Every structure is written in C-alpha cells, then in structure tokens.
Amino acid sequence: MKKVLALVVAAAMGLSSAAFAAETAITPAPTATTTKAAPAKTTHHKKQHKAAPAQKAQAAKKHHKNAKAEQKAPEQKAQAAKKHAKKHSHQQPAKPAAQPAA
C-alpha cells in the first residue's frame, strides 16, 4: 500500500521511474528476530434480508383506502343528479293558526 502511495506521489512530482526504483531498492532488510503477530480473525456478519412485500397496483401504493371503501358502491345516477343534489323536504304544508272562537 505504501509503495502504491509512493508511486502516485512520485508520478505527481514528475520524478522518473528510474529514480523511484533506486529509492525503493534501498529498503532495509527485515531482521529475523522480530516476530509478527497473527492477524486478527475477521468475522463476517450476514445481513438478514426482509421478505419482499407482495406487489400491489400503483394506485394502491399511493392511496390507502379506508374501511369505508369496502362498502357497496351507491347506484349510479344521471350526471345532473350528481351535480345538483336536491334536498327533499317531506314537510306537509303549514296549518293555519287556530283562531279562538269569539
């Protein structure tokens, strides 16, 4: 890793590859008395994948319908009846006020 970094730095500074090779050839030899520690054992953790949800229609994803939508749809009406909802009053005509007999 250090050699790669040194190569990148040397290339950026414009040094020739011969000068770089001469610098790397003079590295000190490692002594035999040093002991290397065993590399730490790496543990690989497996990711738990969630089960994919069932595919739905695009409209169902965007618009969550309430329980009211499950009820039976009303009968279709004419276009005019949809626009002009008239309130029907089932009141009988008002009775005239009772006049006291004089």
Swiss-Prot record:
Single GO cellular component term: periplasmic space
Low complexity bias: start-end ranges: 26-41, 91-102
Pfam family, any one: Asr
Sequence segments annotated as region (Disordered): 26-102
Disulfide bonds, paired cysteine numbers: none
Positions annotated as propeptide: 22-58
Domain of life: Bacteria
Compositionally skewed regions (Basic residues) per UniProt: 80-90
Processing after translation: Proteolytic processing gives rise to the active protein.
Main location group: periplasm
Signal peptide as annotated in the record: 1-21
Subcellular localization, as worded in the UniProt entry: Periplasm
Homology family: Belongs to the Asr family.
Function of the molecule: Required for growth and/or survival at acidic conditions.
NCBIfam families: acid_shock_Asr
Protein name according to UniProt: Acid shock protein
Gene: asr
